[in-house]
């Protein structure tokens, strides 16, 4: 039996911000790595950013920077997002490190020495407009296999690997012009020559391990159709140089160098890296990828390893998944649809809630649509109504009626036989990387605990049979300890919090399951989560639905935003008096405001990532004064401040300053067209209604349908100086 688990998640491209769908792989690998450590298995979890290639070079041109600077910028963005999601890499590296260059070139030279490379001239698309050879993914056209739109390396619809010249009606993705064909010379990996070794390895691997059905199907179909020589060099500047004469101005194809990144990144932290990567007898290599990456991990990367004739650790378990999509739309920063990693951080919703929902719906066998309403329902009913409820009700009841001490009793309640079978089932799901099933089994155990508590009615028996009632509750407390261990791969912050309830008296280890070990006192208890409120979910749904969708909704409902604002919205200037951080959510500021009234107002806002407290105290800001009161993490909020956000997601609170007459706290903000009207104080409204007014910043001025917003008394225009153009919300 193999003793070690070497776990990788597909290296994310560094030239973008990851969205929820991109996070599936790193989160899945994180859960499996945490399970592996829980079982006492020596574990290494490796990931990093994929930084070379045309996509990076082109993005750098767009952002008017160098590829190196672009990679540095996005590496930090990726790293910060993964840290917020509490992903516990053993290393999160980069393919631009020195060891990567050495490793890629060394493997190439071994392939060449062993006769697994060829050289030949080929026809490649060249864009006359942009004066450059076009990378595969910078040519689009019709897939010759299924007829769908595809890029020049692979069709995402049917997963067929392509060459750009295979496409029907090809176009340059940059300028949309039709490219011409020019002759160029490249090095190819001779896959047909490796086919017998690859097929033999595939047969052994399929017999000894479990691959996702879709992965086996796609790989076998690819082998059945026949392997072809595949270019591993290209005409680019940004990449690993080819160590061969006549190829000084070419680099390695990113698909060739990227998988090797798993090895080179491991070298960065371990001098003993060969004990992981050249130890096939004792090491399980478990790789987490999306379905669009299957062939690169089942054919290309294994072929490189086999062709080198070295004893590389080969793929044991391929955990491929389908796509996580968004509200029947595509994730798109430019269109404003979908929620991305940096957006998630600003919602005020804890990372464990996001982790829970992604695992609960992990797209293991089919694509899944992220839906806000389902997000709220699953979190409130399963995570909070089921799991959190069991922890809270049992510990609170025990502490209230039986004190802090946890007696060491014999585990003998009748329910343990059923529970232990469920433990075995859960651990087997983990082992097979059926993460969604593992989580749902854990939730089923929690439901069983709730049912036992409800059926036994300890509130009725605590006085008549106190010892028996106490023993029942103690058994349930040991069940809660076990649940905190089993669920730790999915929601680690919450697991740690439950452990703190017990004074961190036990470890996240399977050796405690079903035992009476590791508990002595309940030091404190508190609610694990606050329910998600409908108004918050509706506001997030609207915010990330894209401007076009918002306009479509507005048109379909025949809403006039000017009339809506005049008749139903009340914006006011307020002065920030004090700011505190929410003790249960550090990202949330609690702002005490002077609104001209004797009592003032209080609002809660997710500003901690954007401002320090002292930057806002004393400033005049704008709030939606007539919003229905709401609670955020248990704190009452009596309004919402407004801010501007541009297309790059830069965010600034609108500060009302630099007027001839200082703004008066409580002064209303109105449309310029209403400056001579007598306006009534409108009734309380939902946040959805406010968003339908569609306030925008245009050339530094706040407007609705071209009409300026102004201060009611001084008639001064409301300005957005720091972000002159963008959405206001």
Curated annotation (Swiss-Prot):
InterPro entries: aa-tRNA-synth_I_CS (IPR001412), Anticodon_Met (IPR041872), Met-tRNA-synth_bsu_C (IPR004495), Met-tRNA_ligase_1 (IPR023458), Met-tRNA_synth (IPR014758), Methionyl/Leucyl_tRNA_Synth (IPR015413), MetRS_core (IPR033911), MetRS_Zn (IPR029038)
Domain of life: Bacteria
GO biological process, one term: methionyl-tRNA aminoacylation
Record's subcellular location: Cytoplasm
Catalytic activity: tRNA(Met) + L-methionine + ATP = L-methionyl-tRNA(Met) + AMP + diphosphate
Residues of the tRNA-binding domain: 565-670
'KMSKS' region (motif): residue ranges: 330-334
EC number: 6.1.1.10
TM spans (from-to): none
Binding of ATP, residues: 333
Manganese as UniProt keyword: no
Binding residues for Zn(2+): 143, 146, 155, 158
Main location: cytoplasm
Cofactor(s) needed by this chain: Zn(2+)
Pfam families listed in its UniProt record: Anticodon_3 (PF19303), tRNA-synt_1g (PF09334), tRNA_bind (PF01588)
Alphabetically ordered keywords of this record: Aminoacyl-tRNA synthetase, ATP-binding, Cytoplasm, Ligase, Metal-binding, Nucleotide-binding, Protein biosynthesis, RNA-binding, tRNA-binding, Zinc
GO MF annotation, one: metal ion binding
Motif ('HIGH' region): 12-22
Gene Ontology cellular-component terms listed: aminoacyl-tRNA synthetase multienzyme complex; cytosol
NCBIfam families for this protein: metG, metG_C_term, PRK00133.1
PANTHER family: METHIONINE--TRNA LIGASE, METHIONINE--TRNA LIGASE, CYTOPLASMIC
Subunit structure: Homodimer.
Role played: Is required not only for elongation of protein synthesis but also for the initiation of all mRNA translation through initiator tRNA(fMet) aminoacylation.
Name of protein: Methionine--tRNA ligase
Organism this protein belongs to: Borrelia hermsii (strain HS1 / DAH)
Source organism phylogeny: Bacteria, Pseudomonadati, Spirochaetota, Spirochaetia, Spirochaetales
